[in-house]
Structures are given as structure tokens and as C-alpha cells.
Amino acid sequence: MGKILIKDCTIVPISGPVIGKGVIAINDDRLHYVGPAGGLPAGWQADTVIDAGDMVALPGLVNAHTHAAMTLLRSYADDLPLKQWLEEKIWPREDRLEREDIYWGSKIALLEMIRSGTTTFADMYFHMDAVAGAVVEAGLRASLCQGLIGLQDTSNKRLEAGISMVKEWHGAGEGRITTMLGPHAPNTCTPEYLTRVAETAAGLGVGLHIHLAETRGEVEDVKARYGATPVALVNKLGLLDLPVLAAHCVHLTTEEIAILAEKKVGVAHCPESNLKLASGVAPVKEMLAAGVNVAIGTDGASSNNNLDMVAETRTAALLAKGITGDPTVVPAHQALVMATLNGARALGLEKEIGTLEAGKKADLILVDMRQPHLMPPNDVEANLVYAARGSDVDTVIVNGKILMARGEVKTLDAEEIYAQVTKRMHKG
């Protein structure tokens, strides 16, 4: 890793005001200095110098909810309601996927994420050891969990796989991999199964990653079965007493929003997937006002259909304004906070990533602002949210290692990945 100096860049630290003509000094895997050039400790020498005169540096983006390997199913089943999409298309196809398929499906996802500025992601799927192996090779940071569909896990084999995932991979990849347990949703797991998973997670010292209140159908189904809404049910069962990352949270009452805030639940808002599946629009304005930690996720590429967090952040900001009729909701800085620090907090990583501050992990991206759609730079944060594209990301650094420079990914062989993914596209 060594020492890296990024000079002459505009810095969006998230934790403070924008810094013009700043420098960032990286010592191995940590940020050593972030600020004006004059403040760099005298005598500090770098092994690698990056001239970033036309660049903006900001924390790496955090994709708070996705299913990386589902990139294999991009454009496979579109324009369908969620229930039909899952039960008639996705789940039958997934039954035919093997470990190697998951590995290569994950690698194409990681390539896409690196190229569009994501440095950390939260993932729920199966054959998660294959996902973890791909993450180690790519150099990204990830929170991984085995997806646990309780109604299909009568022998507890999936739960056992989830436990093995935690024990074998938590802290792997120089600490870049963390783990959770992943009960799929309240309508695909019985209360008894949810309780068992929560108790297991508590014993392992990890949190939970769960889909929650994604569709109106889910809410009605859970109410009909158990006499409570999804949020009320998981709260009653004690799940929310653990660290919880809850994906979607589209259909919520005022009382449920208060519960999420009180229990410090991290919400992964997935606007583009929710729009495409016509699941609804999450009450982001109300959640933020109540103090809920709202992060941003893409969901899987099979329902988005991309993993571009730059685009997702723009959608999150614009959708919140359009649905409320209030143009002041989710201003540019708030959107960037949601895509970085709030994502880190939702994954329990806010002490290490999410802002550019000395002492934190060196996870950052450089965005090339010398683009016609980013000129003039009247407001750097506004340009990043409302005008930037994922393809504007020039450099990606994770844990002090340069994963992409001048748009070239150094840790993955794109042509090999394309060939493998194309070969597996029609499997089964």
C-alpha cells in the first residue's frame, strides 16, 4: 500500500465544508491528512503522487442493499409485479445457479461498482463464500450475509450456512469483509424462524439484514397471517433490539417510523428498484424528519437494472422532491450523506468509513469534473448529485489500495468476466 498523496483536488469530506485546492495524504490503509495543502505535516513524503487538479474527492459510495450475483439475471425478467417476478421467474432460475455462477455474477457486479464509485456494499444471497472470494480479489469492502428464506429452510441448512459464513469470513480480506445474518423477509420466514435467526445473531455478535415492508402485498399478507404489520411483528419478536439493516421500508405508518428511529434501524432506500417493480415510494422525508438513518441501495441488477450509485443518489433526491411536492427535501448535501455516511452507519462502519477524516480508512473516489455536464462548478455538491454520472468516476481507492486509476480497473480482468458471464447467461 505505502504512502499516497492526492494533490490539488477539491475535497467533499461530508463531515465538513467543501475544501478547495486541498490535499489528501494516505498512509497504508488510513487517511493521514485531509485538508488545505498548507496543513500537510512538513517532511511527509509519498511513494505515489496523484495530480488531481480537475478532480473532486469524496468518500467512496456505500451501496446499502444489493444482491451482486443477480447481475446474471439483468434483463432476464422485466416489467412484472414483485410476487410474480420472484415466484415465476427469479426463484426457479436461481435454483439452477451453482457456486461458480455466483462467483462470476458477483465479479461482473464488482466491476460495475468499482467503475461507478461504490467502495462498500451490503449483499444478501447464497453461495456467499463465492461472493466473499470475489470481494477479496476485487479489493472492495462488503457486509455479506446468506439469504435465509425460512419457508424453504425446514432443515436449517441455510441457517447453518449463514452461521458458517459469519465464522469463516468475518474480518477476512484485511478486515474488508464483515458479516450479518440475513432473514429474507417477514412474509418468507415464520415468526419462529425469525426468532431463531435473531437469537443466533445475538450469540454470534452480528446484526441482521432483512427486507421489510417492501410491498403493500407483503404488509397485507403478514397482517393476515400474524395480526401485525411487518415492522410491528419484527419489533415484537425482538429483532429490532439487534443492529438491523432494513431494505426498502416503503409502506410505513407514522408509528412504525417512530419505532425505526427509536431502535436505530438503518434503512436502505432503493428508489429505482421500487419504481421499476411498482412497489411504491418510501416515505424518506418523514423518516429523515423522525431521525431514521436512511441510506441508499440499488437492490439487485435484476430489478434496477444497474448498480450505479451515482444515478441512484440522483433518483433518491429527485423522487423525494417530486412525491412530496417540496423541492427543499433531500438537498444535495443530504443526498451525499445518505450515499456515504448514512450507508456506513447502516452497516455499522461509521467509525471507519463514510467521511474523509484523518484516522479513518482510506476509502475514497475521485470524480473527473472536467466534463461538459459538470461545468461550471458553481456548486460542487449539487453537480455531483444532479449532473454527475457513474462514468465520471476516475479513481477508486479502498483500504489505501488503488483499485481504479484513470478509469482502468486494476484488480479485475474485464474481458475474462464478460466471457464467463455471457457463457452462463442462459444456464438452465
Curated annotation (Swiss-Prot):
State the InterPro entries in the record.
Amidohydro-rel (IPR006680), Deaminase_MtaD/DadD (IPR023512), Metal-dep_hydrolase_composite (IPR011059), Metal_Hydrolase (IPR032466), MTA/SAH_deaminase (IPR050287)
- So where does this one cross the membrane? none
- Chaperone keyword on record: no
Q: Which domain of life is it from?
A: Bacteria
* Top-rank EC class of the record's enzyme: hydrolase
Q: Which residues does substrate bind?
A: E94, R158, H184, E214, D299
Q: Which residues are recorded as binding Zn(2+)?
A: H65, H67, H211, D299
Q: What is its EC number?
A: 3.5.4.28, 3.5.4.31
Note on cofactor: Binds 1 zinc ion per subunit.
- Which cofactor does this sequence's record say it needs? Zn(2+)
Catalytic reactions on record: S-adenosyl-L-homocysteine + H2O + H(+) = S-inosyl-L-homocysteine + NH4(+); S-methyl-5'-thioadenosine + H2O + H(+) = S-methyl-5'-thioinosine + NH4(+)
List GO molecular-function terms, semicolon-separated.
Answer: 5'-methylthioadenosine deaminase activity; metal ion binding; S-adenosylhomocysteine deaminase activity
* Any Pfam family matching the protein: Amidohydro_1
Alphabetically list the UniProt keywords.
Hydrolase, Metal-binding, Zinc
Protein family: Belongs to the metallo-dependent hydrolases superfamily. MTA/SAH deaminase family.
What is the protein's known function?
A: Catalyzes the deamination of 5-methylthioadenosine and S-adenosyl-L-homocysteine into 5-methylthioinosine and S-inosyl-L-homocysteine, respectively. Is also able to deaminate adenosine.
Name of the protein in question: 5-methylthioadenosine/S-adenosylhomocysteine deaminase
- The organism of origin for this protein: Moorella thermoacetica (strain ATCC 39073 / JCM 9320)
